[in-house]
Amino acid sequence: MSRIGKRPITVPKGVQVTIGEQNLVTVKGPKGTLTQKLHPDMIIKQEGDVITVQRPSDEKLHRSLHGLTRTLINNMIVGVTQGWQRALEINGVGYRAQLEGKTLVLNLGFSHPVRIEPPPNISYIVGERKSANDPLSLTVVGIDKQQVGEEAARIRSLRPPEPYKGKGIKYLEEKIRRKAGKAGKAK
Protein backbone atom coordinates (compact mmCIF):
# COMPACT_ATOMS: atom_id res chain seq x y z
CA MET A 1 0.00 0.00 0.00
CA SER A 2 1.27 3.45 -0.86
CA ARG A 3 2.10 5.48 2.25
CA ILE A 4 0.90 8.70 0.61
CA GLY A 5 -1.91 7.16 -1.44
CA LYS A 6 -3.66 5.52 1.52
CA ARG A 7 -3.96 8.78 3.49
CA PRO A 8 -7.47 10.27 3.29
CA ILE A 9 -7.91 13.84 2.06
CA THR A 10 -10.04 16.13 4.24
CA VAL A 11 -12.04 18.67 2.25
CA PRO A 12 -12.12 22.00 4.16
CA LYS A 13 -15.25 24.11 4.57
CA GLY A 14 -16.00 26.32 1.56
CA VAL A 15 -14.49 23.85 -0.91
CA GLN A 16 -16.64 21.77 -3.25
CA VAL A 17 -15.13 18.68 -4.92
CA THR A 18 -16.92 17.00 -7.84
CA ILE A 19 -15.75 13.66 -9.25
CA GLY A 20 -17.14 13.17 -12.75
CA GLU A 21 -16.93 10.42 -15.35
CA GLN A 22 -13.48 9.11 -16.31
CA ASN A 23 -12.13 10.61 -13.04
CA LEU A 24 -12.59 14.25 -14.08
CA VAL A 25 -12.07 16.04 -10.75
CA THR A 26 -13.32 19.62 -10.29
CA VAL A 27 -12.43 21.58 -7.16
CA LYS A 28 -14.18 24.90 -6.41
CA GLY A 29 -12.99 27.14 -3.61
CA PRO A 30 -12.65 30.75 -2.50
CA LYS A 31 -9.70 31.43 -4.84
CA GLY A 32 -11.13 29.82 -7.98
CA THR A 33 -11.87 26.56 -9.77
CA LEU A 34 -9.48 23.82 -10.91
CA THR A 35 -10.32 20.86 -13.13
CA GLN A 36 -8.05 17.92 -13.87
CA LYS A 37 -8.55 14.58 -15.58
CA LEU A 38 -6.90 11.86 -13.53
CA HIS A 39 -6.09 8.30 -14.61
CA PRO A 40 -9.38 6.42 -15.19
CA ASP A 41 -8.15 3.20 -13.49
CA MET A 42 -7.83 4.83 -10.06
CA ILE A 43 -10.84 4.56 -7.73
CA ILE A 44 -11.67 7.94 -6.15
CA LYS A 45 -14.40 7.89 -3.49
CA GLN A 46 -15.97 10.84 -1.70
CA GLU A 47 -17.80 10.25 1.57
CA GLY A 48 -18.92 13.52 3.15
CA ASP A 49 -15.87 15.74 3.51
CA VAL A 50 -13.31 12.90 3.13
CA ILE A 51 -11.85 11.71 -0.18
CA THR A 52 -10.00 8.40 -0.49
CA VAL A 53 -8.01 7.05 -3.41
CA GLN A 54 -7.74 3.30 -4.02
CA ARG A 55 -5.99 1.30 -6.69
CA PRO A 56 -7.65 -1.57 -8.54
CA SER A 57 -4.63 -3.91 -8.41
CA ASP A 58 -1.00 -4.13 -7.36
CA GLU A 59 0.35 -3.71 -10.89
CA LYS A 60 3.40 -1.48 -11.12
CA LEU A 61 1.44 1.23 -13.02
CA HIS A 62 -1.34 1.32 -10.42
CA ARG A 63 1.13 1.40 -7.52
CA SER A 64 2.93 4.35 -9.10
CA LEU A 65 -0.32 6.24 -9.78
CA HIS A 66 -1.77 5.72 -6.29
CA GLY A 67 0.23 8.36 -4.40
CA LEU A 68 0.33 10.65 -7.44
CA THR A 69 -3.46 10.75 -7.75
CA ARG A 70 -3.92 11.53 -4.06
CA THR A 71 -1.28 14.27 -4.17
CA LEU A 72 -2.76 15.89 -7.30
CA ILE A 73 -6.20 16.11 -5.65
CA ASN A 74 -4.69 17.47 -2.43
CA ASN A 75 -2.67 20.08 -4.38
CA MET A 76 -5.87 21.23 -6.11
CA ILE A 77 -7.61 21.65 -2.73
CA VAL A 78 -4.66 23.58 -1.25
CA GLY A 79 -4.53 25.74 -4.41
CA VAL A 80 -8.15 26.90 -4.22
CA THR A 81 -7.93 27.58 -0.47
CA GLN A 82 -4.41 28.97 0.19
CA GLY A 83 -2.89 29.24 -3.27
CA TRP A 84 0.66 28.39 -4.34
CA GLN A 85 3.68 30.62 -4.72
CA ARG A 86 7.27 30.30 -5.90
CA ALA A 87 9.86 32.89 -4.88
CA LEU A 88 12.65 33.98 -7.22
CA GLU A 89 15.66 36.22 -6.63
CA ILE A 90 17.17 38.56 -9.24
CA ASN A 91 20.90 39.24 -8.74
CA GLY A 92 23.03 41.53 -10.87
CA VAL A 93 23.94 45.15 -11.45
CA GLY A 94 21.21 46.85 -13.47
CA TYR A 95 18.89 43.84 -13.33
CA ARG A 96 15.42 45.10 -12.49
CA ALA A 97 11.80 43.96 -12.40
CA GLN A 98 8.64 46.05 -12.26
CA LEU A 99 4.96 45.59 -12.90
CA GLU A 100 3.11 47.60 -15.54
CA GLY A 101 -0.49 46.71 -14.81
CA LYS A 102 -0.32 42.91 -14.71
CA THR A 103 2.60 42.69 -17.15
CA LEU A 104 6.03 41.91 -15.68
CA VAL A 105 8.85 43.96 -17.23
CA LEU A 106 12.38 42.63 -16.65
CA ASN A 107 15.66 44.43 -17.41
CA LEU A 108 18.20 41.61 -17.53
CA GLY A 109 21.13 43.10 -19.41
CA PHE A 110 19.63 42.53 -22.85
CA SER A 111 19.36 45.38 -25.36
CA HIS A 112 15.61 45.47 -24.68
CA PRO A 113 13.35 44.96 -21.66
CA VAL A 114 11.65 41.54 -21.50
CA ARG A 115 7.86 41.75 -21.13
CA ILE A 116 5.98 38.78 -19.70
CA GLU A 117 2.19 38.58 -19.83
CA PRO A 118 0.84 36.43 -16.98
CA PRO A 119 -1.16 33.33 -17.93
CA PRO A 120 -4.70 33.08 -16.51
CA ASN A 121 -4.83 32.57 -12.71
CA ILE A 122 -1.18 33.69 -12.31
CA SER A 123 0.05 36.97 -10.84
CA TYR A 124 3.43 38.41 -9.88
CA ILE A 125 4.61 40.23 -6.75
CA VAL A 126 7.80 42.31 -7.05
CA GLY A 127 9.63 43.09 -3.80
CA GLU A 128 11.79 46.10 -2.99
CA ARG A 129 15.59 46.19 -2.90
CA LYS A 130 16.90 47.20 0.51
CA SER A 131 20.23 48.40 -0.90
CA ALA A 132 21.93 48.46 -4.30
CA ASN A 133 23.75 45.15 -3.70
CA ASP A 134 20.75 43.24 -2.34
CA PRO A 135 18.90 40.83 -4.64
CA LEU A 136 15.43 41.75 -5.87
CA SER A 137 12.63 39.36 -4.91
CA LEU A 138 9.97 38.23 -7.38
CA THR A 139 7.12 35.90 -6.42
CA VAL A 140 4.89 33.95 -8.80
CA VAL A 141 1.44 33.37 -7.25
CA GLY A 142 -1.44 31.20 -8.48
CA ILE A 143 -3.89 28.42 -7.66
CA ASP A 144 -2.42 25.67 -9.88
CA LYS A 145 0.86 24.33 -8.42
CA GLN A 146 2.06 22.99 -11.76
CA GLN A 147 1.35 26.25 -13.58
CA VAL A 148 3.10 28.32 -10.86
CA GLY A 149 6.19 26.10 -11.11
CA GLU A 150 6.25 26.25 -14.91
CA GLU A 151 5.93 30.04 -14.93
CA ALA A 152 8.72 30.40 -12.35
CA ALA A 153 10.94 28.08 -14.43
CA ARG A 154 10.15 30.10 -17.58
CA ILE A 155 11.17 33.35 -15.86
CA ARG A 156 14.34 31.74 -14.46
CA SER A 157 15.29 30.43 -17.92
CA LEU A 158 15.51 34.00 -19.26
CA ARG A 159 18.76 34.55 -17.32
CA PRO A 160 19.84 31.49 -15.28
CA PRO A 161 22.42 32.18 -12.56
CA GLU A 162 26.03 32.04 -13.72
CA PRO A 163 28.65 30.33 -11.53
CA TYR A 164 31.30 33.10 -11.37
CA LYS A 165 29.48 36.10 -9.89
CA GLY A 166 26.07 34.54 -9.27
CA LYS A 167 24.29 37.01 -11.55
CA GLY A 168 20.92 35.99 -12.94
CA ILE A 169 17.55 34.74 -11.75
CA LYS A 170 17.47 31.90 -9.23
CA TYR A 171 14.92 30.26 -6.97
CA LEU A 172 15.02 31.65 -3.43
CA GLU A 173 16.05 28.30 -1.92
CA GLU A 174 18.50 27.45 -4.74
CA LYS A 175 22.21 27.24 -3.95
CA ILE A 176 24.64 28.15 -6.73
CA ARG A 177 27.94 26.32 -6.92
CA ARG A 178 30.43 29.13 -7.36
CA LYS A 179 33.61 28.75 -9.40
CA ALA A 180 36.89 30.57 -8.95
CA GLY A 181 37.83 32.90 -11.78
CA LYS A 182 40.93 32.24 -13.82
CA ALA A 183 44.18 33.00 -12.02
CA GLY A 184 45.91 36.26 -12.97
CA LYS A 185 49.13 36.19 -15.00
CA ALA A 186 52.35 36.87 -13.03
CA LYS A 187 54.16 40.06 -14.09
Curated annotation (Swiss-Prot):
Xref: Pfam families: Ribosomal_L6
Keywords: Ribonucleoprotein, Ribosomal protein, RNA-binding, rRNA-binding
A single MF term (Gene Ontology): rRNA binding
GO biological process assignments: cytoplasmic translation
One GO cellular component term: cytosolic large ribosomal subunit
InterPro entries hit by this protein: Ribosomal_uL6-like (IPR000702), Ribosomal_uL6-like_a/b-dom_sf (IPR036789), Ribosomal_uL6_a/b-dom (IPR020040), Ribosomal_uL6_bac-type (IPR019906), Ribosomal_uL6_CS (IPR002358)
Domain of life: Bacteria
PROSITE patterns found in the cross-reference section: RIBOSOMAL_L6_1
Family, similarity comment: Belongs to the universal ribosomal protein uL6 family.
Subunit description: Part of the 50S ribosomal subunit.
Function: This protein binds to the 23S rRNA, and is important in its secondary structure. It is located near the subunit interface in the base of the L7/L12 stalk, and near the tRNA binding site of the peptidyltransferase center.
HAMAP family: Ribosomal_uL6_B
Protein name: Large ribosomal subunit protein uL6
Taxonomic placement: Bacteria, Bacillati, Chloroflexota, Chloroflexia, Chloroflexales
